[in-house]
Amino acid sequence: DMKDLERCLQEAQAQRFRIVVTDGVFSMDGNVAPMDRICDLAEKYDALVMVDESHSAGVVGATGHGVSELYKTHGRVDIYTGTLGKAFGGALGGFTTGRKEIIDLLRQRSRPYLFSNSLAPGIIGASLEVFKMLKESNALHDKLVENVNYFRDKMTAAGFDIKPTQSAICAVMLYDAKLSQIYAARMQEEGIYVTGFYYPVVPKDQARIR
């Protein structure tokens, strides 16, 4: 809601700092944040921009560099956060990157960074290797996009309602909460892991499996 974002930024003009924080891809519907418009407003009202690329890094964009690649906003985003537990396959852990001045500050002042145990070396090593692989070749990303499109096309042809999205998230809309739980339980019996989501996680009458 860009109008509401602009209203919030206008109301925050008296504050010393302003920061716009958004998901790159919203996990329930798979819809993508309009980063170009968000950055335009942030620059207009002198605000920082922070984007969580957990559901978009490794997936969205021509080479999987996330929504900032999709909307060509590299250099306009100040802070990126992400996870090693999704497209990068490290099972757990996450990262924050961005402008050097901000990262230097976080190393000194971020309590989660200062007072948390570090990740296991094996996870770090595997994750670094994944980043290296993605730099060297687009093959894994391209295959993922191919698989997502195949799944979406076949499910739609079979009569299922799939929310349109530029991401890899394919929410299969069932609308009825009880039905979503029946579907999820039955699929898990077949060894297919899905979760049924219903109100209040999603709006009423918008139950789905994902």
Predicted regions: what is each one?
Residues 1-51:
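Active-site phosphate-binding strand-loop segment of PLP-dependent enzymes
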Residues 49-50, 162, 194:
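Hydrophobic beta-strand scaffold residues
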Residues 63, 69-105:
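Active-site PLP attachment segment
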Residues 88-155, 160-163:
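PLP-dependent aminotransferase class I/II
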Residues 142-151, 156-190, 199-209:
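Conserved PLP-binding catalytic core of the aspartate aminotransferase-like
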